[in-house]
């Protein structure tokens, strides 16, 4: 029989190796906030003829938008003049729909690059952006507290029910840090922004992670009643092996669906789907190799043992 519990420190180490780089980027550079959080205008258009992104930036700079963020989307082609594309996304200071500022920009773009089709035009004020950001933080915090309370109540008949809730929250935070950390890296190097859909993805990842964790915890609870006399380590290991295939199969079904959405869906939901993909993979891993194994470490007082072992060594030096 495979002994998953025996390798728990290796799984903890792997989690740290994944989380630490993203956390460093998050602390040093933060997330690249979209207009939903900072305010501004997101404008996505598709020209009839291919254009160079550098030329679009130059046109916007001439109109007074020197700090505009411009990037391509969709198919690109290489020509003698450089890389060209028909799809252009622009992040600008707040511009109202049907305003003189927008009319001026439309005239500049059409006179220089020809006709285009407007795909998306979204404008959010700074005050609304701050409100969305604050509400997003509150939503995630309330979801975490609700999960902790529910798990503690659901497992109230086992010993130390709050341990189950706390370990589930730790696994959930693991998944959130993985997603947020990767998006901090993508934001720094590829200009990927987060918006309200990103918060929706995080809440979905939290729900999936906790759901998967509860399935494993519930099997541990059942086996504690059925396998009276066996050690907690043995019960957890058996429970993990019994739920492993089910967890992986469920996750793979979701992952294949998300992959189809990522490659064949619209550009506006790509980052949302990417966040879900990362979160589902991380949630599957953490529910199997983190949450339940943390219960074992807590039961065995593993971390106290490590601290006690390091204290004499520190005193000897």
Curated annotation (Swiss-Prot):
The chain crosses the membrane at residues 11-31, 135-155, 166-186, 197-217, 244-266, 276-298. Keywords: Cell membrane, Membrane, Protein transport, Translocation, Transmembrane, Transmembrane helix, Transport. The keyword Transport applies. One of its GO terms (biological process) is protein targeting. SUPFAM superfamilies: Multidrug efflux transporter AcrB transmembrane domain. GO terms for cellular component: plasma membrane. It is found in: Cell membrane. It is a multi-pass membrane protein. Its main location: membrane. InterPro entries: SecD/SecF_arch_bac, SecD/SecF_bac, SecD/SecF_CS, SecD_SecF_C, SecF_bac. Part of the Sec protein translocase complex. Interacts with the SecYEG preprotein conducting channel. SecDF uses the proton motive force (PMF) to complete protein translocation after the ATP-dependent function of SecA. Belongs to the SecD/SecF family. SecF subfamily. This is Protein translocase subunit SecF. It comes from Thermobaculum terrenum (strain ATCC BAA-798 / CCMEE 7001 / YNP1).
